[in-house]
């Protein structure tokens, strides 16, 4: 490719609405162009990166014996109504009507359509297992699109769906896809971590997320440096911080804490460690039976320095669909405003749940259900009946690892892939069955596996950039090598040697671009450093007189002189690494 025949459009400054590094650099490098909230045109430079991401994914999916198809962007409402997701998805699901008044969804995911394909095409156990995948545009009507390709409304994903006879088959298919994902992300040249995760709204049980490691990542990844244990914050198990509860040493005492409504302030006033305080979180669950709505109030207790894990809380039996109680509801049940709540002497009965760590505490401090007062010296069994105990908190750095092999560490990551064991969550609601060896219908076991194709671009940049611009891993770069001739239009020697090297690199299969635009050296170098091409070769009269060219990797502090006749092999060796 010659730069004069390609479209290159760079900016010195990022648009004012670009918030994070990847968004700013992609806009400045001319890779994307915003045309609406969360909607972008992929410009030629950016599209080249997308195509390289897709090519790696497609090759590894094919190697894993997944079969490519292409499902529609616009999908009939009836399919989504079968699974109930037409209503469950809420406003994020874009709904449209055609001229006949028929309703359709602009798909954010394709479980319904692929299940419909399988239930009509797969009849016998002999046709299983099978795995279909596609790479398709999606649309999710995000409430607040931001961060460029990291959280847009229109985006591209690879979705694969496996179908098996039984759970054992599903687990095998799941492992095959998990291994394929590891190969894909290794080929991308990115630092990543696979972590155990919660299935969330998509349903089923058993899943892993794949995260690109980045300090700017939205997600907290929990792992043990001494083992293979890794989970996202939602799924990471928080073990009790003591093996047994100590005996009481203090009497229950109602203590004045004027104006101290936060655990931190109470601990400071009483000259106690924050870890000796307990915070109260009030949740409300409304249930309807025969047209009558009843309300249940739940009181969850956490250590003062811990945070509620809302995903874990939702798994407490009977609490599904909870919301945080309003101040009016809190006063109705506790006769006191937030800040002084506790489990002793509530105005109305509540369902009490305590975190594992709280269950092992003694002589702790909690609200007294009276403004400006807390109880000290609170102990289970004596002052309070034993309560339901669940793991309901976020882990913190230094917690014991659930596998017993050390303590936990936390790093930030950007989710770019997710694999799920769906089981029969969709085949049951859509009646997707096969006939077994005895001619009896059996529900198909299903798995689904997604990679955010366009999100990979943003995540890769968040991990790989400097003050000059993007630093693409070679496998993802729009071009592997850029040739920067000094005076290409003025020096016959420079032009001849540049053209010769360009043709040799092309013949060797190197993805090379020759910058023949006639730009000044400073501007030319700045463009390619911003765009992030990983390998640069400079050809100039001065070097040619000595029979040398200059090579500089995008991460290199200085250029390396290389003999003219050795440059092709030198570059090939760099690319091989």
Curated annotation (Swiss-Prot):
GO terms assigned for molecular function: aminoacyl-tRNA deacylase activity; ATP binding; proline-tRNA ligase activity
Keywords assigned: Aminoacyl-tRNA synthetase, ATP-binding, Cytoplasm, Ligase, Nucleotide-binding, Protein biosynthesis
EC number of this enzyme: 6.1.1.15
Substrates-to-products reaction catalysed: tRNA(Pro) + L-proline + ATP = L-prolyl-tRNA(Pro) + AMP + diphosphate
PROSITE patterns: AA_TRNA_LIGASE_II
Gene3D superfamilies xrefs: Anticodon-binding domain (3.40.50.800), Bira Bifunctional Protein, Domain 2 (3.30.930.10), YbaK/aminoacyl-tRNA synthetase-associated domain (3.90.960.10)
Location in the cell: Cytoplasm
Any one GO CC term of the record: cytosol
Cited InterPro entries: aa-tRNA-synt_IIb, aa-tRNA-synth_II, aa-tRNA-synth_II/BPL/LPL, Anticodon-bd, Anticodon-bd_dom_sf, Pro-tRNA-ligase_IIa, Pro-tRNA-synth_IIa_bac-type, Pro-tRNA-Synthase_IIa_type1
Alphabetized CDD domains for the sequence: ProRS-INS, ProRS_anticodon_short, ProRS_core_prok
GO biological process: prolyl-tRNA aminoacylation
Top-level division of the source organism's lineage: Bacteria
Function: Catalyzes the attachment of proline to tRNA(Pro) in a two-step reaction: proline is first activated by ATP to form Pro-AMP and then transferred to the acceptor end of tRNA(Pro). As ProRS can inadvertently accommodate and process non-cognate amino acids such as alanine and cysteine, to avoid such errors it has two additional distinct editing activities against alanine. One activity is designated as 'pretransfer' editing and involves the tRNA(Pro)-independent hydrolysis of activated Ala-AMP.
HAMAP family reported in the protein's UniProt record: Pro_tRNA_synth_type1
Domains (record comment): Consists of three domains: the N-terminal catalytic domain, the editing domain and the C-terminal anticodon-binding domain.
Family: Belongs to the class-II aminoacyl-tRNA synthetase family. ProS type 1 subfamily.
Oligomer and partners: Homodimer.
The name this protein goes by in its record: Proline--tRNA ligase
Species per Swiss-Prot/TrEMBL record: Janthinobacterium sp. (strain Marseille) (Minibacterium massiliensis)
Lineage: Bacteria, Pseudomonadati, Pseudomonadota, Betaproteobacteria, Burkholderiales
């Amino acid at each position: 490719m010659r730069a004069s025949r390609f479209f290159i459009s760079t900016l010195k400054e990022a648009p004012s609405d670009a918030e994070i590094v990847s968004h700013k650099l992609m806009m400045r490098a001319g890779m994307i162009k915003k045309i609406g909230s969360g909607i972008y045109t992929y410009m030629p430079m950016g599209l080249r990166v997308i195509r390289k991401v897709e090519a790696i994914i497609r090759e590894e999916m094919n190697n894993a014996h997944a079969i490519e198809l292409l499902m529609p962007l616009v999908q009939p409402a009836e399919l989504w109504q079968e699974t109930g997701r037409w209503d469950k998805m809420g406003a994020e699901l874009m709904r449209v009507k055609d001229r006949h008044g028929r309703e359709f969804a602009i798909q954010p995911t394709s479980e319904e359509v692929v299940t419909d394909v399988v239930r009509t095409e797969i009849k016998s156990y002999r046709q299983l297992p099978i795995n279909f995948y596609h790479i398709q545009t999606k649309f999710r009507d995000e409430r607040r699109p931001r961060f460029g390709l990291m959280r847009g409304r229109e985006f591209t994903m690879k979705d694969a769906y496996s179908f098996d006879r039984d759970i054992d088959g599903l687990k095998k298919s799941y492992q095959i896809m998990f291994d394929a994902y590891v190969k894909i992300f290794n080929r991308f040249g990115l630092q990543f971590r696979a972590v155990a995760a919660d299935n969330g709204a998509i349903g089923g049980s058993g899943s892993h997320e794949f995260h690109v490691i980045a300090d700017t990542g939205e997600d907290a990844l929990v792992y043990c440096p001494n083992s293979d244990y890794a989970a996202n914050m939602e799924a990471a198990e928080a073990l009790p911080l003591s093996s047994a509860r100590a005996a009481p040493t203090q009497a229950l005492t109602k203590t004045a804490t004027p104006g101290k409504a936060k655990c931190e302030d109470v601990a400071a006033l009483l000259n106690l460690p924050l870890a000796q305080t307990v915070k109260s979180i009030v949740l409300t669950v409304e249930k309807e039976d025969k047209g009558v709505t009843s309300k249940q109030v739940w009181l969850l207790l956490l250590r003062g320095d811990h945070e509620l894990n809302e995903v874990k809380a939702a798994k407490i039996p009977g609490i599904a669909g909870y919301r945080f109680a309003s101040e009016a509801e809190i006063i109705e049940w506790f006769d006191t405003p937030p800040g002084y709540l506790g489990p002793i002497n509530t105005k109305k009965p509540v369902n009490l749940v305590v975190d594992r760590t709280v269950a092992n505490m003694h002589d702790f401090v909690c609200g007294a259900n009276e403004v400006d007062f807390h109880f000290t010296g609170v102990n289970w069994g004596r002052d309070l009946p034993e309560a339901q105990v669940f793991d309901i908190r976020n882990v913190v750095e230094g917690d014991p690892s659930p596998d017993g092999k050390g303590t936990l560490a936390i790093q930030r990551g950007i989710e770019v892939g997710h694999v799920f064991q769906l089981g029969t969550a969709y085949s049951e609601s859509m009646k997707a069955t096969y006939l077994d060896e005895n001619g009896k219908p059996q529900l198909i076991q299903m798995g689904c596996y997604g990679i955010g194709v366009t999100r990979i671009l943003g995540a890769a940049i968040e991990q790989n950039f400097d003050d000059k611009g993007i630093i693409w891993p070679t496998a993802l770069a729009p071009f592997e090598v850029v040739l920067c001739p000094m005076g290409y239009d003025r020096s016959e020697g420079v032009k001849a040697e540049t053209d010769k090297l360009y043709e040799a690199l092309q013949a060797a299969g190197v993805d090379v671009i020759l910058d023949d635009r006639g730009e000044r050296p400073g501007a030319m170098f700045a463009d390619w450093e911003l765009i992030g091409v990983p390998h640069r070769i400079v050809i100039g009269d001065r070097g040619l007189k000595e029979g040398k060219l200059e090579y500089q990797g995008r991460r290199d502090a200085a250029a390396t002189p290389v003999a003219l006749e050795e440059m092709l092999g030198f570059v090939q060796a760099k690319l091989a690494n």
